[in-house]
Amino acid sequence: MGSPGLRPTLLLPQVLLLLLALLHVPPSQGFPGSGDSPLEDDGVWSSHSLYKDTPWCSPIKVKYGDVYCRAPPGGYYKTALGTRCDIRCRKGYELHGSSQLVCQSNRRWSDKVICKQKRCPTLTMPANGGFKCVDGAYFNSRCEYYCSPGYTLKGERTVTCMDNKAWSGRPASCVDMEPPRIKCPSVKERIAEPNKLTVRVSWETPEGRDTADGILTDVILRGLPPGSNFPEGDHKIEYTVYDRAENKGTCKFRVKVRVRRCGKLNAPENGYMKCSSDGDNYGATCEFSCIGGYELQGSPARVCQSNLAWSGTEPSCAAMNVNVGVRTAAALLDQFYEKRRLLIVSTPTARNLLYRLQLGMLQQAQCGLDLRHITVVELVGVFPTLIGRIRAKIMPPALALQLRLLLRIPLYSFSMVLVDKHGMDKERYVSLVTPMALFNLIDTFPLRKEEMILQAEMGQSCNT
């Protein structure tokens, strides 16, 4: 046993250490914390191995993270000097700072850490649209795209910020897929005016409207434009408009034009019919005439009336009945006025060679004579044995003589006189004339040209 005076001196350090351990008073200046600032490394194991079984640093708490600590060998507390702690952030959060902390001799952890919520890149605002997010661009935030009126969303409507700091799906866009709107007028029905086959129809040009940006690039019309004269029938009008996205809108309507009509008329047998306008529409007029050798009976003209009935009576063409019992040559000629042309053949005797040859040529050209409305009148002999003949009818000698005197036809020689439908002396012949030469002359007459047109329409010719 030693000196009693030395025992207090030997026990004093042990007592102080025990007291410090019980009161948690650090041996050096400093303050506890969870890593407010890094100080020194953990190379104090040997010099501070004395404190490895003593709580030293403050417990680590990481919001939105988990802490996994390992005490030094032989240690008991996970906040003892030299303890190493691994920091892991929860899903959707990322670590800022060191992933491993060490409890240092200054009672501080080697670094300060924090788990921050992960953030995705800011979404691009779609043109002509936008988006709304639940929690901005942070993890698990859901954003929903929307488009302005007239635009359609293309792509995924909803995206979510994922753990890899990327958005689910591709960014959406707003495209103009809605066609422009255009409204056409209603069906228009019109009735043609008298003697007309068309109706002037007008309407306001329809205006298109684009539901997106309101801009239209083209307006195309198919059909007659407004203000046109529409013929009889059913006409389809179509307007098409395009917007800048090349979407098209279409509207259609119809224009109906009706022509009021009477029943169709036919030309009388052995006659002609010439009608105005379309021949049977309200207001149309049809005129009738007969071929040479026939006389018109009934109405010379008929009109399609508002009650859709024809005026007058139905015409007909009757064979011309020449009256040779009239007293004067003028009265005889009046029967042919505007109806027939006359070719008067005069000879002092039936034995005249020119007369016989000429009559033979005319008989062979009877079709051409009929086509040109020519009646042959024969004056044969010298008064009082003079006779006149119109085909099968014989005129009295006195009437035949008057005709010679009226037209100044020589009494004692062969001659011919061509008289037109107006009683005019057109040509005289003192020798033979071929039917072709005669026909060529007559075909130059103005009235004959109109006849030729009608005959062509009716298909009348000497070739048929």
UniProtKB/Swiss-Prot annotation:
Pfam families xref list: DUF4174, HYR, Sushi
PROSITE patterns (alphabetical): HYR, SUSHI
Gene3D superfamilies recorded: Complement Module, domain 1 (2.10.70.10)
Keyword Repeat: yes
Keyword Metal-binding: no
Any one of the GO CC terms: endoplasmic reticulum
Tissue: Normal cells and cells transformed by human papillomavirus type 16 E6E7 and polyomavirus large T. Suppressed in cells transformed by oncogenes such as V-SRC, V-ABL, V-FPS, V-MOS, V-SIS, V-K-RAS, and polyomavirus middle T.
The entry's keywords: Disulfide bond, Glycoprotein, Proteoglycan, Repeat, Signal, Sushi
Domain HYR: 177-259
Domain Sushi, residue spans: 57-117, 118-176, 260-319
Alphabetized InterPro entries for the sequence: DUF4174, HYR_dom, SRPX-like, Sushi/SCR/CCP_sf, Sushi_SCR_CCP_dom
Residues annotated as signal peptide: 1-28
Coiled coil: none
A GO biological process held by the record: autophagy
Glycosylation sites: 34
Paired cysteines (S-S): 57-85, 69-103, 89-115, 120-161, 147-174, 262-304, 290-317
CDD domains per record: CCP
Protein name: Sushi repeat-containing protein SRPX
